[in-house]
Amino acid sequence: MVSYNIGFGAYEDDYSFFMDGGTESWAWSKERLDENLSLIAQTLKDQMADYYFIQEVDTDSTRSYHRNEADILRRALTGYSSVWGQNYDSPFLFWPLTQPHGSSVSGLMTFSSAPIASSLRRSLPIETGVMKLVDLDRCYTVSRVPMENGRELILYAVHLSAYTSDGTIAIKQMEMLLDDMQAEYEKGNYCVCGGDFNKDLLGNSDQVFGISAGDYTWAQPVPAELFSGKNIAKIAPLDQDNPVPSCRNADAPYHSGQYVVTVDGFLVSDNVTVSSATVIDTGFAYSDHNPVTMTFTLQP
């Protein structure tokens, strides 16, 4: 299984984004965007995974030259069932003045090598007031894959909030997601969630990667008490011998000493056995995230 926030194909290693304190609001050019999307698609294909979760996939956005990136990924991952969940539909944003961000339609995707019987989109609680303007229409998708033993593998694709005033909304989002997964587990189903949690999944990324978070407070650890009474576990991808972060701060081009953190990962129910979870080191060449992988088996 692979999860990858592709950053709408714009975040090359020399890219910074205005909403993160950087300068850019569009991909550098149509040509560079297309090249990045091609490399992203090839990276995904190379993993030969059974399941993929992909975030920040634009379908009709000014910032990505109105490329339908969902169609590009579908063509790359032929033979897979796919699900699209829209989590960003923004009218024309006239900022920054030098190159307005424009309008955006974006979402997250799930790909499965086994047929998906049904899927739905569930809205998550989001900020109100001014913060709502910079946050997405947060959601997660729920896709059901029938198993031979009569149970279902429930695939949850998620991208939680980053731009919040005090972190309360992100906690409420996690609570809703975990309650949903727990309910499905109690029915006897297998539950696996993958995506960008915008939380420090390791809990100590600054120590693991040797770079202080400093004033960057957007990626807080996930409170352990959220899992109390739940049969759900957090899986933070990490190779102890060669630790690689899953995300870089996008307030400047990628450079040595830049703040990095692991925010991409997985949640699994107790009847799912995880054998490995790692981060693929792309050097942040075509996204501000690295893809993360997890190998697992379903218990009888």
Question: Where are these predicted regions, by residue range?
Answer:
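Surface-exposed cleft-lining segments at the edges of enzyme active sites
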Residues: 23-29, 57-59, 124-133, 159-168
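Solvent-exposed loop/turn segments at secondary-structure junctions
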Residues: 6-9, 58-61, 87-91, 116-117, ...
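Short hydrophobic/aromatic beta-strand or adjacent loop that forms the aromatic wall/cage
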Residues: 105-108, 136-142, 260-265, 288-293
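A well-ordered secondary-structure block
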Residues: 89-153
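Metal-dependent phosphoesterases centered on the DNase I-like endonuclease/exonuclease/phosphatase
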Residues: 164-270
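N-terminal, active-site-proximal structural segment of metallo-dependent hydrolase catalytic domains
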Residues: 1-76, 84-105, 300
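Conserved beta strand-loop-helix elements of the APE1-like EEP
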Residues: 75-78, 102-119, 257-273, 297
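Active-site beta-strand/loop signature of hydrolases that rely on acidic residues for catalysis
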Residues: 1-6, 36-66, 111, 143, ...
